[in-house]
Every structure is written in structure tokens, then in C-alpha cells.
Amino acid sequence: MATINMTPGDLELGRDRGRIGKPIEIPLLENFGFDSQLGPFYLGFWNAVAYITGGIFTFIWLMVMFAQVNYNPVAFAKYFVVLQIDPPSSRYGLSFPPLNEGGWWLIATFFLTVSIFAWYMHIYTRAKALGIKPYLAYGFTGAIALYLVIYIIRPVWMGDWSEAPAHGIKALLDWTNNVSVRYGNFYYNPFHMLSIFFLLGSTLLLAMHAGTIWALEKYAAHEEWNEIQAPGTGTERAQLFWRWCMGFNANAYSIHLWAFWFAWLCGITGALGVFFSMPDFVNNWFQWGIEAGINYPQGPTPPVSLP
């Protein structure tokens, strides 16, 4: 039987320390794959800042779009996906424009950024308080890097807020497509290639890990710490299954390392791919692909003869 060495005092956090409410049992949650316990909820300073600033961003975003349809709830629901808050036009550069010409976008982006960093501090400080390593916060930096490059770093580098996407569902998709078209097709962007590789790879790793543990539930393979050291258990069967099918085994620890790095690198390489898509670095990824030898040069159009 495995023993867990716990540093004395790590979990002696007191009765309150920012917790809100008492735990309650909701058995219905178990039908959706969750634990039945709900709460207690920890607020704390950073979490409060994250929720307040995130709420302000959401309020500005929704109300500005609501005003665009003259506060018509039917039209708001109908066109919600295509409504957006546009950034300032290129003539304003990095200056602060009137509210209805991009000012609301700047204000909303400020509160969104504060909310994201406050949430990072919340999960970091909570991990430290529990005596665990803040790897969840470290993983979150991959998403933060991509966000900062798209909304702040790249537009500031180019001296133009209009290079950032609008706040909206369809608007973000349109921005991604437009940047790809302007800079010669993202398919030839090596960082985009890596980002998609890590995106699909992390999805595959998660599916492989989840499928293996789910398949061995009847052997209690989800109790990994005790399972991994005993013969004939679900975990041993999982290791044998991987060796039989793939020739090697990723254990309950290493599979999470693989998944972490794949997911983190998805955001980091995506951020690099977006950042280098500008005239100062790469103006045409298709031409870059030709020069890098991963794409055929464009030849002259063959003559067309009509009968």
C-alpha cells in the first residue's frame, strides 16, 4: 500500500480563509461525470478582482452590442453571433478615440486583460496556499501569451489598434481569416503548423488517456496511486494494453506531462505565428514557404488554346 508524505501544516488553512458557503451534495452531478459535492467556494482578493473586471467587460460588450440593434431584444438574440465591438480605425493609431469609434473596445479590452491576469494570480496563489506546484497557472500562460499577442503586443508593435480583432463571436473568426489572407495563407506559417500539431496532438493524448481509464473503470483504474503498484489491477492492464498496441507505455504520470506540454505549446506556437505575421517579419507566408523549400515556386500560367 502506498503512503503519502504530507508536509505538516500544508492543509491547516483554518475554517474560513475566504471560503464562502458550506459544501452541499447534489447527486445529480454524478450523472454528468462530476463529483456530487458543490462548494465551498473560495473568493479571495484576486478572484474578486477577476469576477468584477470580467463582469464589467461582459456588461460593456453586451450593452454596446445591444445598443447597435436599438435595444431590441429579438434583434439582439437573432444577430448576437454577428454583433461586435470594433477596435479603433487605423487613423487613430494607438491614441484613444471617441467611445463610439473604438473607445468602448479599448475600455472593454482593458478590463478583460485585468480579469485574465487576476484569474492567473488566483489559481497561482491558491496552489501555493495548498502546498501544490502551480502547474495549472503555468499552463494558463500559454493561453495568456496568445491573447496578449493578438490583442495587445502585435497591435502595439504595428502602431495600430485596428490590427486587433473586434470583440464578437464571428468577428474573431473573420479576423483570423483576414490575417491569413493578408499574409499569404497561414497554412505555410511554420508556427501555425506546430500550433495545429500540438492542438490535435493534445486532443489525441487526452482521448487516449481518457479512453484507457474509462475502459478500465471496472478494475478501479481511476485510483491510480494505489493501482500502479499492484499486479493484476486496472493500471497494470492499461500498461500492458499500451505496450501490446503501441510498443511503449505512457504511465499515469507521464501521460499528463505529454498532455500539458502539447496543450501549452499550442498557445505559445500560435502566439509566435500571429506575431511574425506582419510586414516587419513575414509579409507573405506562401512566398516564405517557397524560399524555405516547402512549397513549389509558382510557374507561368500555361497557354490555353481553344478549338
Swiss-Prot record:
Gene Ontology MF term list: bacteriochlorophyll binding; electron transporter, transferring electrons within the cyclic electron transport pathway of photosynthesis activity; metal ion binding
PTM sites of type Blocked amino end (Ala): A2
Membrane topology: Multi-pass membrane protein
Record carries keyword DNA damage: no
CDD domains for the chain: Photo-RC_M
Binding site for (7R,8Z)-bacteriochlorophyll b: H192
Recorded GO CC terms: photosystem II; plasma membrane; plasma membrane light-harvesting complex
InterPro entries per record: Photo_II_D1/D2_sf, Photo_RC_L/M, Photo_RC_L/M_CS, Photo_RC_M
Pfam families (alphabetical): Photo_RC
Keyword Magnesium tagged: yes
Annotated transmembrane regions: 45-69, 103-123, 133-153, 196-216, 257-277
Binding site for Fe cation: H209, E236, H256
Biological processes per GO annotation: photosynthetic electron transport in photosystem II
Cellular location(s): Cell membrane
Function: The reaction center is a membrane-bound complex that mediates the initial photochemical event in the electron transfer process of photosynthesis.
Family: Belongs to the reaction center PufL/M/PsbA/D family.
Name of the featured protein: Reaction center protein M chain
Species this chain originates from: Chloroflexus aurantiacus (strain ATCC 29366 / DSM 635 / J-10-fl)
